[in-house]
From Swiss-Prot:
Gene Ontology biological-process annotations: translation
Annotated protein name in UniProt: Large ribosomal subunit protein bL33
Family matches, as PROSITE patterns: RIBOSOMAL_L33
Source domain of life: Bacteria
GO molecular function: structural constituent of ribosome
Length: 54
């Protein structure tokens, strides 16, 4: 298997509507569903939920 098949690069987009994104890798075997993480959005200066964008 290729490196990108197991751990592809994904974008995490802010739910605050600012358009701010984080880029990370995800293990498809352990997390087949979409990821949601609480991270800092510097545009609104708060911790908000970021969801995986496909």
């Amino acid at each position: 298997m290729a490196r990108n098949d197991i751990r592809p690069i994904i974008k995490l987009k802010s739910t605050a509507g600012t358009g701010y994104t984080y880029v990370t890798r995800k293990n498809k075997r352990n997390n087949p569903d979409r990821i949601t993480l609480k991270k800092f959005d510097p545009i609104v200066r708060k911790h908000v939920e970021f969801r995986e964008e496909r």
